[in-house]
């Protein structure tokens, strides 16, 4: 416990900056506000002479908690989805592969990124997982920036851009946020503790095979198994999720310190181009499903769009689009 206390003592400045950044991000309706707000403000502060750091001793437990949180989006409907909608599932896989290959090729040829960096930077989703993976794989700040900044730009670009497309095609709708409503009884806390324990065991197993980002991957696999089969229903409350995202955003923002503003602008510019390419590919695949299989174009387009899962689901609810059927 003393080690964790000392780690918090070394990291508290970054965490406080992250909380402020997350709060400011909510005021301007930034997507993934507590993550991106904490990341961006820590990044800005890192350009100054004010020294901030985030201890890895805290970072690893945060990854495990976030893995359990992400696994909470799984449910038994995932099993039915592949069985009932095989064509859209295949199209989703192909769309992801095509988008990743095209954008990775762009990053390698135009931006001169390394191949493994280009692949991570090109993936059309899972910003949290990708950001934690690159932080765990390399200590090179420039390579981290080459992945995290284009990925953050993708989330911002796509999530801010998508609602305008829906307004022009369907009309204005109010998009309300929503969260998990839990009953905080003994069973709830036992299930949460159980998920953390089995995720810790899974982490130890993956670490033996030297798999990167073991805490978050183990938690998603192990906890995801129990969530998918609905053997457990307890999920972390929204406030706990926001705290975890502040910690993650602060950790990532600190680790990008040392990048020149010119490099950040360069990575952001190409992140916007990446987003446009991925949206174009998503539109093509959605159009194919509409023409040949009769799928609703806007629903299919939204499911293929390279935005965050939470934001896409919120938009689907606002526009009464059932993503489970595509």
Where do the model's predicted regions map?
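Structural signature of hydrophobic alpha-helical transmembrane segments
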Residues: 25-38, 60-62, 86-96, 119-122, ...
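Entry/N-cap segments of selected transmembrane alpha helices
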Residues: 11-13, 17, 74-105, 192, ...
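Hydrophobic transmembrane alpha-helices of secondary-active transporters
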Residues: 39-84, 222-229, 238-264
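Membrane-interface helix-loop-helix junctions at boundaries between adjacent transmembrane segments
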Residues: 104-160
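Transmembrane helical segments that form the transport core of multi-pass membrane transport proteins
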Residues: 205-289
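Transmembrane alpha-helices that form the ion-translocation and gating core
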Residues: 90-127, 270-318
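Conserved small/polar residues in nucleotide/adenosyl-binding loops
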Residues: 325-326
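Membrane-interface helix termini and inter-helical loops of multi-pass transporters
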Residues: 76-84, 169-186, 230-236, 262
């Amino acid at each position: 416990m003393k080690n964790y206390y000392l780690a918090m003592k070394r990291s508290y400045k970054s965490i406080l900056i992250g909380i402020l950044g997350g709060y400011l991000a909510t005021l301007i309706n930034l997507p993934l506000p507590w993550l991106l707000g904490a990341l961006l403000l820590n990044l800005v502060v890192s350009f100054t002479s004010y020294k901030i750091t985030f201890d890895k001793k805290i970072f690893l437990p945060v990854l495990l908690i976030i893995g359990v949180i992400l696994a909470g989006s799984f449910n038994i409907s995932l099993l039915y989805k592949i069985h009932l909608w095989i064509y859209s599932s295949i199209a989703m896989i192909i769309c992801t592969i095509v988008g990743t290959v095209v954008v990775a090729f762009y990053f390698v040829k135009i931006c001169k990124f390394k191949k493994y960096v280009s692949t991570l930077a090109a993936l059309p989703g899972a910003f949290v997982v990708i950001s934690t993976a690159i932080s765990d794989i390399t200590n090179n700040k420039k390579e981290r920036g080459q992945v995290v900044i284009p990925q953050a730009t993708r989330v911002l670009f796509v999530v801010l851009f998508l609602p305008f497309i829906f307004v022009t095609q369907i009309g204005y709708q109010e998009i309300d946020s929503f969260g998990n409503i839990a009953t905080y009884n003994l069973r709830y806390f036992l299930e949460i503790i159980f998920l953390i324990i089995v995720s810790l065991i899974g982490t130890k197993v993956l670490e033996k095979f030297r798999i990167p980002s073991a805490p978050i991957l183990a938690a998603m696999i192990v906890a995801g198994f129990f969530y998918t089969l609905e053997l457990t229903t307890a999920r972390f409350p929204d406030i706990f999720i926001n705290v975890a995202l502040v910690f993650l955003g602060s950790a990532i923002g600190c680790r990008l310190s040392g990048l020149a503003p010119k490099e950040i602008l360069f990575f952001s510019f190409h992140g916007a181009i990446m987003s446009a390419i991925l949206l174009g590919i998503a539109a093509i695949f959605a159009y194919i499903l509409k023409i040949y299989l009769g799928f609703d174009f806007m629903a299919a387009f939204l499911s293929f769009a390279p935005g965050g899962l939470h934001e896409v689901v919120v938009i689907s609810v606002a526009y009464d689009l059932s993503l489970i059927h595509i």
